[in-house]
Structure formats: structure tokens, C-alpha cells
UniProtKB/Swiss-Prot annotation:
Pathway: Protein modification; protein glycosylation. SUPFAM superfamilies: Nucleotide-diphospho-sugar transferases. Keywords: Acetylation, Endoplasmic reticulum, Glycosyltransferase, Magnesium, Manganese, Metal-binding, Phosphoprotein, Transferase. This is Dolichol-phosphate mannosyltransferase subunit 1. The modification N-acetylalanine is found at residue 2. It catalyses: a di-trans,poly-cis-dolichyl phosphate + GDP-alpha-D-mannose = a di-trans,poly-cis-dolichyl beta-D-mannosyl phosphate + GDP. Pfam families: Glycos_transf_2. GO terms for biological process: dolichol phosphate mannose biosynthetic process; dolichol-linked oligosaccharide biosynthetic process; GPI anchor biosynthetic process; protein mannosylation; protein O-linked mannosylation.
Length: 260
């Protein structure tokens, strides 16, 4: 009995009261970027607007991987405009992968919650207050945006890409049974310590990395809440999804199926 009480008093089991945001809560938004010069000012402005209106404490950490289009210069200007207490540029010299970008960002994050999202305007910051409310209502370890539940959806894709996405998600649901409706989405809120542990367990790269994060979360018995979101295809620049990514996705899916 005493052992059980001690276990429940450990950091893993301590939870805030449901439905309440603590004054100490801070949300660190990680924005990995590569060639996002046009999109970055818009997404940062929308983030600042959303957090200012909702009243949540926040910081935005930009992790630029040596973009040749001047993304770093834009980020430096944004840091000056909004202040280094809100915008932190933490660049790297070259592309080193999404997982390592999150690790790099978390080293500089002072929040106890981490929000990950795309910097290309595919994910609208207006959903962040819903993520936070959902997390507090259920004391979830993770809250994931979903395109495949409720009033969630995808806009700006042609029919072919929508079909590929639906089929890929259907296959992953059958093979992996993840307990979440959208495995490949990258708009999520994590408890910081949960994200740190999951990244330490994951070995995948690219788009499969997001899938593995949810699969490992299920294995570790972390709780996952979902919020329907509208995903909009990138406004500026070219999509980074191509034939090589699709092949990597299929290989990664089979690897996860065989090892989880």
C-alpha cells in the first residue's frame, strides 16, 4: 500500500486539477524551419495573436536548419520585433532531421508543455487554445490534432493526394492499432517530460517519426486526447512530400509493424 502511494506521488503521476490552467504553465512552441522565409512572419504573427488573446504564457522557438532562402535572417528580425523573451532563434548549420530538431529546441525550452507544428501555415494557431483546454479537461499526456475525426479535414489537396492520405491512414490503423485517428499529423501538444522520453525511444526519421511517437506513447501507456483540426496545404513554397517520402513511409510502416 505504501509503495503504491509513493508511486502515485512521483512526477509521472502528479497531475493538475482537471480543467484548470496553472499560473506556472508555460507553452513552448517548437517551429523547425527549412526555406520558410515567406511563411514564417505570418505563422509567428498568428501565434502571438492567439496566445495574446487567450492569455496563456508562451515562447516560440525557431529551429532553422541552414535554410538557403534567408529564413534565418527573417527569424532574426522577428526576434527583434517581438522580443527575445517570446521569440528565440536557435539555428543549426544544416538539415539534421525532425527528431533532432525537437531535441535541440527542447534544450532551450523553458515551458512545461511543448507544442509542435509546421511553420508553413498548414496548422492554424487558432486551435492551440482548444488543445490546451482538451489537455486540462482530461489531464492528457498528449493532445494530437486530427484531420480524420469530427469536423476535421484537409483543404488545398487534389483528389489523388487526399486518396493517398486516407489509404495510408487506413493501413496504419489496421497494422498498428495506435489508439489515435491521425498518426501522420504533426500538430501536437506534449507534456515536456513525455516528449523527451518518447524521442529517446524513437528511431524513425521523416514522416514515419510522427507515427512512431504515437505508437510508442501507446506502448508506454501515455494518454492521448484529440482535437479536430483543419489542415491547409502550404501557402508559399513547394510541398516537401514526394516519391522518396512515400517509399520511406511504407518502409517505416512495415518496420513499426514488425517491431511494435
Amino acid at each position: 500500500m505504501a509503495a503504491e502511494e509513493a508511486s502515485r506521488s512521483s512526477p509521472r503521476f502528479r497531475r493538475e486539477p482537471k480543467g484548470r490552467v496553472s499560473r506556472q504553465d508555460k507553452y513552448s512552441v517548437l517551429l523547425p524551419t527549412y526555406n520558410e522565409r515567406e511563411n514564417l512572419p505570418f505563422i509567428v504573427w498568428l501565434l502571438v495573436k492567439s496566445f495574446s488573446e487567450s492569455g496563456f504564457n508562451y515562447e516560440i522557438i525557431i529551429i532553422d536548419d541552414g535554410s538557403p532562402d534567408g529564413t534565418r535572417d527573417v527569424a532574426e528580425q522577428l526576434e527583434k520585433i517581438y522580443g527575445s523573451d517570446r521569440i528565440l532563434l536557435r539555428p543549426r548549420e544544416k538539415k539534421l532531421g525532425l527528431g533532432t530538431a525537437y531535441i535541440h529546441g527542447m534544450k532551450h525550452a523553458t515551458g512545461n508543455y511543448i507544442i509542435i507544428m509546421d511553420a508553413d501555415l498548414s496548422h492554424h494557431p487558432k486551435f492551440i487554445p482548444e488543445f490546451i483546454r482538451k489537455q486540462k479537461e482530461g489531464n492528457f499526456d498528449i493532445v494530437s490534432g486530427t484531420r480524420y475525426k469530427g469536423n476535421g479535414g484537409v483543404y488545398g489537396w487534389d483528389l489523388k493526394r487526399k486518396i493517398i492520405s486516407r489509404v495510408a491512414n487506413f493501413i496504419t490503423q489496421i497494422l498498428l492499432r495506435p489508439g489515435a485517428s491521425d498518426l501522420t499529423g504533426s500538430f501536437r501538444l506534449y507534456r515536456k517530460e513525455v516528449l523527451q522520453k518518447l524521442i529517446g525511444k524513437c528511431i524513425s526519421k521523416g514522416y514515419v517519426f510522427q507515427m512512431e511517437m504515437i505508437v510508442r506513447a501507446r506502448q508506454l501507456n501515455y494518454t492521448i486526447g484529440e482535437v479536430p483540426i483543419s489542415f491547409v496545404d502550404r501557402v508559399y513554397g513547394e510541398s516537401k512530400l514526394g516519391g522518396n517520402e512515400i517509399v520511406s513511409f511504407l518502409k517505416g510502416l512495415l518496420t513499426l509493424f514488425a517491431t511494435t
